[in-house]
């Protein structure tokens, strides 16, 4: 059976960076499930299709190629806004969850990060992590990331956006953001990326040892 690591958490908590490091460490396949919603939204926008037609959005979601998700292209703010509109559609979520589960079966192992991996997509994952940080810390990270990339950023606007996204993610009727009961909580507010990685690695190593 494939070894699955589920990493959930709110926006800008550091789960993407952590997931990529873990996947690299163990030679596992990595999927940022948030990009699957963004890819669906971009496909709709590129085709000039409406973002409020659930049947059309579901059909588009079923045609998304998970092997060709380009983080740089899909990180555009307008795509993120569109993705948040289709992400609340149950039919779209069902279609993408099916694709994400199929990805999770890849050998020798997979790391999936998102909002509902440990609770909905892969409830039987060998390791479940819930990565979080205070809204202030997450907004500062996002702000610094944009500035480092040569962009202009307004901390207050980003902070408000982080809080808005938290409310939307946690208040969603279908698959709300919450830690799985058996998830290990990693608060990265005061943690470096390296410290978070080492904490996660300890948990993964222990689970791998149990599997053997």
Swiss-Prot record:
SUPFAM superfamilies (UniProt xref): P-loop containing nucleoside triphosphate hydrolases
Enzyme class: transferase
Keywords recorded for this protein, A-Z: ATP-binding, Cytoplasm, Kinase, Nucleotide-binding, Transferase
A Gene Ontology BP annotation from the UniProt entry: pyrimidine nucleotide metabolic process
Places the protein is found: Cytoplasm
Pfam family, one: Cytidylate_kin
GO molecular function: ATP binding; CMP kinase activity; dCMP kinase activity
Principal subcellular localisation of the protein: cytoplasm
One GO cellular component term noted in the UniProt record for this chain: cytoplasm
Residues binding ATP, per UniProt: 9-17
Enzyme Commission identifier(s): 2.7.4.25
Alphabetical list of InterPro entries matching this protein: Cytidylate_kin, Cytidylate_kinase_dom, P-loop_NTPase
Coiled coil stretches, renumbered: none
Reaction it catalyzes: CMP + ATP = CDP + ADP; dCMP + ATP = dCDP + ADP
NCBIfam families named among the record's database cross-references: cmk
Family: Belongs to the cytidylate kinase family. Type 1 subfamily.
Name recorded for this polypeptide: Cytidylate kinase
Species this protein is from: Rhizobium meliloti (strain 1021)
């Amino acid at each position: 059976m494939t070894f699955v690591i589920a990493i959930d958490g709110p926006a800008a908590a550091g789960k993407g960076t952590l997931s990529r490091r873990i996947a690299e460490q163990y030679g596992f396949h990595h999927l940022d499930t948030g990009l699957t919603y963004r890819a669906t939204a971009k496909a709709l926008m590129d085709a000039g299709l409406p973002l409020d037609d659930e049947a059309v959005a579901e059909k588009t979601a079923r045609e998304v190629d998970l092997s060709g998700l380009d983080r740089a292209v899909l990180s555009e703010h307008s795509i993120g806004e569109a993705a948040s509109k289709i992400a609340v559609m149950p039919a779209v979520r069902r279609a993408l969850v099916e694709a994400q589960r199929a990805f999770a079966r890849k050998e020798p192992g997979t790391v999936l990060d998102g909002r509902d991996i440990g609770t909905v997509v892969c409830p039987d994952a060998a390791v479940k992590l819930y990565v979080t940080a205070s809204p202030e810390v997450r907004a500062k990270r996002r702000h610094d990331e944009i500035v480092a990339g040569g962009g202009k950023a307004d901390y207050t606007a980003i902070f408000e956006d982080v809080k808005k996204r938290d409310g939307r993610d946690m208040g969603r009727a279908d698959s709300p953001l919450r830690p799985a009961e058996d998830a290990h909580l990693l608060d990265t507010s005061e943690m470096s990326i390296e410290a978070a990685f080492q904490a996660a690695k300890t948990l993964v190593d222990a689970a791998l040892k149990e599997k053997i």
